Structures are given as C-alpha cells and as structure tokens.
Regions:
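Hydrophobic transmembrane alpha-helix segments characteristic of membrane transport
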Residues: 52-88, 175-189
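Membrane-interface segments at loop-to-transmembrane junctions
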Residues: 38-41, 73-89, 188-203, 233-238
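Alpha-helical transmembrane spans of integral membrane proteins, capturing the lipid-embedded, hydrophobic core
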Residues: 56, 60, 80, 84, ...
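Binding/recognition "hotspot" determinant
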Residues: 1-52
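Hydrophobic alpha-helical membrane-insertion segments
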Residues: 2-12, 86-107, 197-211
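Non-cytosolic segments of integral membrane proteins
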Residues: 45, 87-171, 175, 214-263, ...
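Extended serine/threonine-enriched, polar tracts that run as long, contiguous segments within proteins
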Residues: 176, 180-182, 187-202, 206-207, ...
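Selective recognition of hydrophobic, aromatic-rich stretches within alpha-helical transmembrane segments
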Residues: 50-57, 163-167
C-alpha cells in the first residue's frame, strides 16, 4: 500500500509542480493570445454599454424631475452630466486601464521575488520542491509518504486556484464596460464599485501570494541548499517530517489568500 502511494506521489508531483512553476505567480497580459476571447467579449460589452447610455440619460432625467422623492436621487444636472461623462470614459477606456493594472500587478509580484539578497525563481523553486519530495519518501515510513501526498494535493489546489483566478479575470474584463456604465447614476453606482473591488482583488491575489512565498523563502528556505544535502528547506536538522510540514504550511497559506481577499471584496457590499 505504501508503495502505491509513493508511485502516486512520484508520478503526480512532476506535472503538478510543472503547472505551478509556469503559471501561479502571474496574469497573462491583456494583449496575450490567452486573452483574445476576453478582448472580443469586451468589445461586445462595449457596444451594449454605449447603446444603453440612452436609457441611462433617460433615467437620469427622470431622477432630476422627481427631485428628492426617491432614495439616492439627490442629483443636480451638473452632477448627472459629470457622472455620465465619467462613466462613458471609464467604460470605453477600461481595457486600457486593465492592461496597465495587470502590468503593475505582475511587476509588483516579481519585485517581491527578485528584490533583496536572495532572488527567488518560482520555476526553480517548484522543481526543487518536487525533487525534494521524492527524496524524502521512505519505503518504511508511510506517514512521510502521506505528508508528501498532502503537499502534492495542496500544490494541485494552488494550480486550480490559478485557473479560477484567470477565469474570473476574463469575466471581469468582459463585463467591464457594462459594469462601469453604472457609475452614471447614484442608484446603480454600487455595481460599478463592486467591479472595481473585484478586479483589484483578483490582481491582489498574485501579489499577496508572491509576498508569502518571498517571506517564507527568507525565513524557512535554505540560503545554501547545496551545503545541506540538497535540502530545500533551510533547517540543518535534516528532519524529513519537519520539511514536509513546512511545505504544507506554505502551500496552505498561499491557498488561503484568495478567501481572505474575497472577504474584502464582498464585505463592503453587505448591508
């Protein structure tokens, strides 16, 4: 039974950590081939949003005529005009703004990893962890094999979170023109604000994960891995269980980052 788990960990660790090393710490640029479908959907949403501005102007006129008889309708003609212009510009320039935001988030995430004395290459680090897991497994130590399996499962969850994050990013890109047009009226402004929190949140996830990885590398990982028997984690005791537990802790914190960010996205929208 222990041999079966070892074969499972060995066969699964390489492709899973290959996924993690190549994807998890970044977001594809807005002009990348992966974002072609998102750009196409953004163009469709832009057409719909620009068409709906006629309806928004009509609703704004109705709010002006009702005066202050409706909640959130305290609006002057000047404020309505400023809101309409701002919403129109935000809707039609949203793709450019998102592109700059992605570049900024990628650059900030990279800065956390490459700044300081020890530069961290997530690709090299993932390869080392995958090799380290294989060397830590012992035919006579089933518990270490189960811990190694837990590391592989958590790494798979981290890759799955990346896929979900990119999917949500593409949805937010596609919905940007329609969501931002709701800045035009006070009654619908909350929808546009929710979009801003959403796009900020999905980009903040990779930055926070990079910060966690950089901090963990400085505190837990060996600065001279070649001097401690090839160990990745920087504890000279060579305790395999402790190495695996530290890897599990690191991956668990990185997996929890999206849920912490999600709270900040949704909480302001709650009554």
């Amino acid at each position: 039974m222990n041999g079966w788990f070892q074969d499972l960990v060995t066969s699964a660790s390489k492709p899973i950590f290959e996924l993690v090393r190549s994807t998890v710490m970044g977001t594809p640029q807005i002009d990348a081939p992966e974002m072609a479908r998102a750009r196409s959907l953004w163009g469709t949403s832009q057409t719909i949003a620009n068409t709906c501005y006629v309806l928004l102007i009509t609703l704004g006129g109705m709010l002006l005529m009702t005066g202050q008889s409706l909640p959130g309708s305290e609006l002057t003609p000047g404020q309505l005009a400023a809101r309409l212009v701002g919403a129109f510009l935000a809707s039609n320039l949203s793709l450019v703004l998102i592109g700059y935001a992605i570049v900024f988030a990628n650059g900030l995430a990279t800065a956390f990893l490459v700044s300081g004395e020890n530069k961290i290459d997530p690709k090299v680090l993932a390869d080392r962890v995958a090799r380290h897991i294989s060397t830590l497994m012992s035919p006579d130590y089933a518990f270490a094999t189960l811990l190694a399996l837990a590391v592989v499962v958590l790494a798979l969850c981290l890759g799955f979170i990346y896929i979900i994050r990119i999917a949500i990013t593409m949805v937010l890109i596609a919905a940007a023109p329609i969501a931002l047009m709701f800045h035009a009226l006070p009654l619908t402004d909350g929808i546009a604000r929710l979009w801003w929190r959403g796009i900020t949140g999905v980009l903040a996830i990779q930055v926070a994960q990079s910060l966690v990885l950089a901090t963990a590398y400085e505190l837990l990982f060996s600065k001279n891995p070649d001097q401690d028997g090839g160990s990745v984690l920087g504890l000279p005791s060579r305790i395999a269980l402790l190495d695996l537990l530290l890897a599990i802790a690191l991956l668990w914190v990185m997996i929890r980052v999206p849920s912490w960010v999600a709270r900040t996205v949704w909480q302001p929208a709650q009554p």
